[in-house]
């Protein structure tokens, strides 16, 4: 999986990490380059983790949306919309590919990456997503296409770059992630 990921992290992010590690090594005055290399590799590994953590985020939001749809069907007096929800987002082809990817699932499980401790963030991001114009346009289109599914996720990831609740949670998860998010999404 890591060999595939090397292509997924931007060269710019890797260069920044190398420069920061080199600067830290020179400032420390240490002669031991091995410790500095280990610090650099830890930083790069954490960037891989962030990549996967962000990659599984739309999957968790889609699961939350699906749970909401199932709960709505169980109301005492469900509406027509409750009984026949628009499942376009839940059935997003790209989200399904990510959710069913053994490579993604294996890496996330091995590194214990998930969003289970942050249901309030998932709820907040779901609300922000469903209130956005690009989501409303996506859901209103009668046809389903891979290009539309991709565009929805592109817009969602762009929006994540300035999402304060996400920044706070990511910083809580790992202090090394606070500066990397713009380069990952």
List each model region and its residues.
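Class I Rossmann-like S-adenosyl-L-methionine
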Residues: 1-185
């Amino acid at each position: 999986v890591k060999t595939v990921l090397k292509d997924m992290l931007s060269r710019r992010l890797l260069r920044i990490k190398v420069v920061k590690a080199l600067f830290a090594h020179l400032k420390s005055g240490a002669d031991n380059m091995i410790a500095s290399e280990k610090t650099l590799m830890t930083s790069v590994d954490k960037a891989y983790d962030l990549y996967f953590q962000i990659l599984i985020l739309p999957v968790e939001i889609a699961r939350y949306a699906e749970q909401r749809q199932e709960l709505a069907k169980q109301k005492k007096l469900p509406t027509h919309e409750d009984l026949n929800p628009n499942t376009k987002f839940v059935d997003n082809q790209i989200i399904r590919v990510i959710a069913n990817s053994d490579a993604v699932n294996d890496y996330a499980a091995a590194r214990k990456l998930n969003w289970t401790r942050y249901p309030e963030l998932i709820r907040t991001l779901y609300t922000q997503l469903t209130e956005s114009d690009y989501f409303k346009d996506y859901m209103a289109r009668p046809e389903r296409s891979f290009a539309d599914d991709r565009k929805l996720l592109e817009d969602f990831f762009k929006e994540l770059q300035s999402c304060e609740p996400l920044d706070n949670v990511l910083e809580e998860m790992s202090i090394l992630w606070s500066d990397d998010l713009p380069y990952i999404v």
